[in-house]
């Protein structure tokens, strides 16, 4: 039975139930009100999602998108360039992972093969010149629509569930399996997992490079998350502080953490992402509720 048949059947049942209530005077106005309320409720129930969400639509060059073109539910960043045109670009998490130190050489090579054009090289060069990644790059949202043309139109959800315009398809969030971090003593033992994005920094060949992690944890308190991350990255923090002392730089923090949403533990699935003959192991956070919070930094 399809959704329309289910809706009609539910409305008929509602009408019959109302007629059985002898204390209610049944007239055309009352019946119409009941049916209309039931129809609105069913629309939400059948789609499984509320109508309220916050999303933004932006344009970005199609050359900067690769797996994002064919896979919705991808985390996007806003990049402020140092040039007048274009002043702002939008790039994906997979794009930034192609230059992250915590991604293996094999996966980094695969990502580089996905993004192959001169514009990608130019944008990566601009990002590498940033003192901190977050100086110019900030989280933007999760894609729910990609429309290609001379430029790509992106619809990104910043708060709410990720679904299409007709509310027929519910998307999750797709993340590289390599960058998943689960710091809980017993991971995934609670019904809800909170999702955070963590950026940290490390000296590599006398140069500061960034790393990106997606953290899954049952803890909601961000101060507690920061304490856990400090312990987890104890060695990296020591090396980073040593770099600060020897380089005479003005950098002030080792990393940052920002909550991007939550999802049910049972909705966390392992899978594969394929693009141009390249296959990557990913984690899919199905039915994620996006809720971008303020970024917190730590030393």
Swiss-Prot record:
This is Triplex capsid protein 1. Keywords: Capsid protein, Host nucleus, Virion. Its main location: virion. One of its GO terms (cellular component) is host cell nucleus. InterPro entries: Herpes_1. The lineage of its organism: Viruses, Duplodnaviria, Heunggongvirae, Peploviricota, Herviviricetes. Signal peptide: none annotated. The gene is TRX1. One of its GO terms (molecular function) is DNA binding. Belongs to the herpesviridae TRX1 protein family. It comes from the Viruses. The keyword Amino-acid biosynthesis does not apply. One of its GO terms (biological process) is viral capsid assembly. It is found in: Virion; Host nucleus.
């Amino acid at each position: 039975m399809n959704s329309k048949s289910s809706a009609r059947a539910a409305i008929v049942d509602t009408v019959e139930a109302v007629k059985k209530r002898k204390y209610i005077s049944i007239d055309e106005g009352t019946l119409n009100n009941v049916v209309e309320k039931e129809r609105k409720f069913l629309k939400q129930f059948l789609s499984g999602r509320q109508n309220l969400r916050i999303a933004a639509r932006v344009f970005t060059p199609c050359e900067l998108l690769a797996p994002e073109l064919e896979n919705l539910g991808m985390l996007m960043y806003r990049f402020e360039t140092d040039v007048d045109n274009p002043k702002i670009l939008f790039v994906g998490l997979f794009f930034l992972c192609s230059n992250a130190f915590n991604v293996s050489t094999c996966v980094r090579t695969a990502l580089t093969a996905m993004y192959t054009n001169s514009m990608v090289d130019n944008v990566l060069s601009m990002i590498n010149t940033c003192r901190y990644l977050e100086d110019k790059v900030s989280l933007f949202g999760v894609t729910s629509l990609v429309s290609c043309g001379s430029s790509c139109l992106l619809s990104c959800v910043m708060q709410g569930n990720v679904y299409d315009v007709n509310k027929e398809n519910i998307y999750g969030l797709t993340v590289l399996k390599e960058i998943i971090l689960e710091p809980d003593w017993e991971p995934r033992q609670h019904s809800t997992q909170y999702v955070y994005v963590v950026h940290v920094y490390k000296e590599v060949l006398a140069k500061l490079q960034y790393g990106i992690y997606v953290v899954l944890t049952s803890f909601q308190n961000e101060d507690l998350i920061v304490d856990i991350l400090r312990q987890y990255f104890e060695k990296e923090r020591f090396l980073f502080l040593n770099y600060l002392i020897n380089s005479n730089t003005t950098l002030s923090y080792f990393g940052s953490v920002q909550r991007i949403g939550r999802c049910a533990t049972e909705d966390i699935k392992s899978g594969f992402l394929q693009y141009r003959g390249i296959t990557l192991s990913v984690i899919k956070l199905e039915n994620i509720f996006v809720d971008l919070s303020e970024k917190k930094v730590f030393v």
